[in-house]
Design a protein with these regions (language model features):
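Structural signal for the C-terminal ends of transmembrane alpha-helices
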Residues: 35, 56-62, 107-119, 150, ...
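Membrane-interfacial loop-to-transmembrane alpha-helix junctions, especially the N-terminal start
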Residues: 16-23, 60-75, 131-135, 247-249, ...
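Membrane-interface transmembrane helices that cradle and orient dolichyl/undecaprenyl
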Residues: 307-308, 312-327
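Transmembrane catalytic cores of multi-pass membrane glycosyltransferases
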Residues: 29-37, 170, 271-272, 343-348, ...
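Membrane-embedded, hydrophobic transmembrane alpha-helices
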Residues: 2-128
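Membrane-interface alpha helices of multi-pass inner-membrane proteins
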Residues: 297, 327-343
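Transmembrane alpha-helical segments of multipass membrane enzymes and assembly factors
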Residues: 51-67, 88, 236-251, 321-324
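Active-site lumenal/periplasmic loops and adjacent helix-entry segments of GT-C-fold
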Residues: 44, 141-311, 343-347
Length: 456
């Protein structure tokens, strides 16, 4: 009889582990992280890029391609803000980070017991196997980004440490923010102006600081995470274009990620003339004709864009159907969480919302106002940053230093810009078209950034 009881207990434990294996692993990871820095790093990556998304996607009816964007986007937004507020109360430390992860484990267990996921892991893997071309594209985007960044951002050689790019001066600032936070600068002040409150949308750097804090000084983490964020951007573009078909979505993803202006002509010219030199050739001309950095270069260097653009693209996908109450709420929540990461994308989300509201005015529903919950979520940061935000009118700013603005836009915005006009009739609905026109014209009317081209 004791043998039977023991056998029954083993069977019950085995079944419980099979049913709750993910919960068990997630519970063990933060605990084991206290004794292993390598496990701590892995845990931070999982909990800040995956776990919150696994929790909250159950509350929204999303398609698989939308979930693949939702999971990393909401994970970064939620985990970073959770740790921020906990750190304000209890202090910023490695232990508080793991305590926040344990809070997420508890929430995951409670939610999982009440709401089933639409997709199982096996189901996702099965569908993923059918989309090998898409997977290959995303893998190539990650590898290309990682190779470029690992050889250009914090690349050590005999002469010192290499940091390059069209906006190379900003990269040290990102490192200063990350390392100063992890060395006691919390709540953070400007690392290069001690005593001045942080006036920069720094939360993407705070996310990197959180991940690094679990391991220790790790400057190569920035190229890795940037590569991951570029893939998230690619996923967001794919999700936005997916209603137009799989082939169109893949094509759009490649063009949006790697498409740039026509400044690469100078690269071909330098190569064919034998004048190419990696140390001196430069695609960007500050306040000159090629004055807008290519989007891929922006994604490599402008870190706030790494989360701002994916959230904006994801919101565009959500706002196409304002009849769906849950998606309207989700768009508002994501927008509200976005503000400390990237203020310009926050404003772009509001511009898209008002366009969608206008287009749906004949079928107005009260739930369409739920998007405004974003203002409540972002309120603490809106109040604290209001003094540092300045809006200036810059009517037709390109005319102030260019003879031919039309040629300037074609040359700098390049292939994606031209294709947008050529195929604008094929885009379903008017929502994306109007948003495109408004956001294209906006930098010619107002500027809220130090440089006008930053508005692009």
């Amino acid at each position: 009889m004791p043998f039977m009881t023991k056998k029954l207990q083993e069977i019950l434990v085995s079944r419980a582990l099979q049913k709750h294996w993910l919960f068990t692993i997630l519970l063990l990871l933060p605990i084991l992280s206290l004794v292993s820095f390598h496990i701590g790093l892995l845990t931070a990556i999982i909990f800040t890029l995956i776990v919150p998304g696994l929790i909250f996607h159950r509350f929204f009816s999303l398609k698989l391609h939308e979930i693949l964007v939702f999971v990393p986007v909401i994970s970064v937004l939620v985990s970073t803000q959770l740790i921020y507020y906990l750190s304000l109360i209890l202090g910023y430390s490695r232990e508080i980070i793991f305590a926040a992860f344990l809070v997420l484990v508890v929430i995951y267990g409670l939610v999982k017991s009440k709401k089933d996921s639409t997709y199982s892991f096996k189901g996702i893997l099965k569908i993923a196997q059918l989309n090998k071309v898409s997977l290959l594209i995303f893998l190539l985007i990650f590898l290309i980004s990682a190779v470029i960044l690992c050889r250009s951002v914090w690349f050590e050689n005999d002469l010192g440490i290499v940091i390059t790019g069209s906006n190379w001066q900003d990269t040290p600032l990102h490192y200063e923010i990350i390392e100063s936070i992890n060395n006691g600068n919390f709540p953070p002040e400007m690392p290069n102006y001690a005593g001045n409150s942080m006036s920069y949308h720094y939360f993407v750097d705070f996310h990197t600081a959180i991940v690094e804090k679990t391991y220790g000084f790790l400057p190569k983490l920035l190229p890795f995470l940037n590569s991951v964020f570029i893939v998230i951007f690619a996923l967001s573009v794919y999700s936005l274009a997916r209603p137009n078909g799989k082939r169109a979505a893949i094509f759009t993803t490649v063009i949006a990620t790697f498409g740039w202006g026509l400044s690469y002509i100078s690269l071909f010219s330098a190569v064919t003339s034998g004048q190419f030199n990696i140390a001196t050739n430069y695609m960007y001309q500050y306040n000159g004709f090629f004055g807008l950095p290519p989007i891929f270069d922006n994604l490599l260097q402008q870190r706030p864009l790494l989360i701002g653009l994916p959230v904006f693209a994801f919101n565009l996908a959500l706002m196409r159907n304002m009849e769906n109450k849950n998606k309207t709420i989700l768009a508002g929540v994501v927008t509200g969480l976005l503000f400390p990461f990237h203020a310009v994308s926050f404003l772009c989300c509001y511009a898209a919302y008002f366009v969608s509201l206008l287009l749906n005015s004949n079928h107005f529903r009260k739930h369409q106002l739920y998007f405004l919950v974003s203002a409540i979520i972002a309120l603490p940061f809106l109040v604290s940053s209001s003094a540092s935000v300045s809006i200036t009118f810059t009517p037709l700013w390109a005319l102030s230093f260019l003879k031919d603005p039309i040629l300037f836009y074609i040359a700098n915005l390049g292939i994606p810009f031209l294709l947008s006009f050529i195929f604008i009739k094929r885009i379903k609905g008017t929502f994306l078209k109007i948003v495109f026109v408004i956001l294209f014209l906006a930098p010619n009317l107002i500027s809220i950034t130090p440089n006008p081209w930053d508005m692009y």
